[in-house]
A protein has these predicted regions:
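Amphipathic alpha-helical packing elements
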Residues: 33-70
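A well-structured
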Residues: 56-58, 64-67, 73-98, 107-111, ...
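Acidic/His-rich structured neighborhood in mature extracellular/periplasmic domains
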Residues: 66-247, 259
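Pan-zinc metallopeptidase signature
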Residues: 250-354
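Bacterial N-terminal signal peptides that target proteins for export
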Residues: 1-7
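Bacterial N-terminal signal peptides
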Residues: 7-18
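Stable alpha-helical elements in mature extracytoplasmic
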Residues: 39, 59-66, 128-132, 182, ...
Length: 354
């Protein structure tokens, strides 16, 4: 029996247990992922093929180099994950819907049989995402729909007893980025295989962000494959440092607005006044960015600020960064040793799930 048939039969049983309300969502998730896997090509075969463009070969060699480094030097799981490649033919892999109450900075959560509760809901089809977002708006929620360039199965389908067909692939969206961002994205997705806490998106994403940041730094310092980079290694790392400085400035703006918004929502004033003050805060946030945008060195957030901002946008920034410093401190406490650090993170994860 073909591998995809086995998965479909397994998912079919889950659909029956999950009930009709989620059937459409799980079906699009399964069929979308299987459609992606059906297009996966082995990276080694692509590198050996005369039909593969030199540009793609260069990027795939960099992927192989990073993957080997993080497995050997950092101790990330050694499995069949990220040994295949998928050309998506578009600049995103899924569209993600997020939601929040209009007068509360608390993300709406969706609970899944395979991953616990998360603060987002992903769709492979953009129209499906916008249709679902419209349904959520009818519940008088703040809603946003954003493109996502990467996702992983958290290592669940990279098991040695499963056919390589199921393993997570490298996506063409990784390769559309600068080398520093490509390296960071790959490390981030591989880090999700180390630990995953049900119902705690901030823990999972902040952990992966820290691992990507430190992993990128170590790779650029210690890698001997300097011929794989676009430009020299020092320039790549300096670009990444500049990008991190830009992200910190952006986060400072968002965090300031976030804190002020919490005060407004907690105040003993009418909901109508709260909504008015909320819009005033977003207006001031845009003004603040306009006055400081020349301070950004390599990144621009102009498109982000062109959106009709709501609570989901503030929460989205918090989701990926709120606990990064905590993991950085833990790494130092473990003498910057990856095995000890990962063990300590697993202990934290186990404690939080009790």
């Amino acid at each position: 029996m073909r591998a995809w048939t086995v998965l479909l039969l397994s998912l079919g049983a889950v659909f029956i247990l999950s009930g009709c309300s989620d059937l459409g969502f799980y079906w699009q998730a399964a069929s979308g992922h299987l459609g992606l896997l059906n297009r996966k090509q082995d990276i080694r075969e692509l590198l050996n093929s005369p039909e593969t463009s030199p540009e793609l070969k260069q990027k795939l060699k960099l992927v192989e180099s990073v993957r080997t480094f993080v497995i050997v030097e950092m101790g990330l799981p050694d499995n069949e994950g990220y040994t295949g490649y998928v050309d998506l033919g578009r600049p995103y892999v899924t569209m993600v819907v997020t939601a929040a109450p209009p007068l509360e900075l608390k993300a709406y959560q969706w609970c899944y049989w395979f991953a616990g509760c998360q603060e987002y809901r992903g769709y492979f089809d953009e129209n499906d995402a916008h249709s679902y977002a419209a349904e959520m708006k009818q519940q008088e929620l703040d809603v946003s729909v954003e493109p996502v360039t990467a996702y992983s199965t958290l290592g669940w389908l990279n098991k040695p007893w499963l056919p390589n067909y199921f393993s997570d692939p490298v996506l063409s969206t990784f390769l559309l980025q600068r080398d520093a961002e490509l390296i960071a994205a790959l490390i981030h997705e591989m880090a999700h295989q180390v630990v995953y806490v049900n119902n705690d998106t901030a823990f999972n994403e902040s952990f992966a962000v820290f691992v990507e940041q430190e992993g990128l730094r170590q790779y650029l310092i210690h890698s001997e494959n300097t011929d794989l980079f676009e430009g020299n290694r020092e320039n790549i790392y300096q670009w990444y440092l500049s990008a991190e400085k830009d992200r910190r400035l952006f986060r400072q703006m968002i965090n300031t607005t976030f804190d002020k918004m919490k005060i407004i929502f907690a105040a003993e004033i009418s909901d109508e006044v709260k909504l008015q003050k909320k819009e005033e805060l977003f207006y001031k946030l845009r003004e603040n960015y306009d006055s400081q945008k020349n301070e950004f060195q390599v990144l621009s957030y102009g498109n982000w600020f062109k959106q009709k901002l709501n609570n989901t946008h503030l929460l989205g920034v918090q989701r990926y960064q709120s606990r990064v410093e905590e993991f950085a401190l833990l790494f130092e406490e473990q003498q910057r040793k990856w095995p000890q650090f990962f063990d300590a993170v697993r202990e934290l994860a186990n404690a939080s799930e009790k």
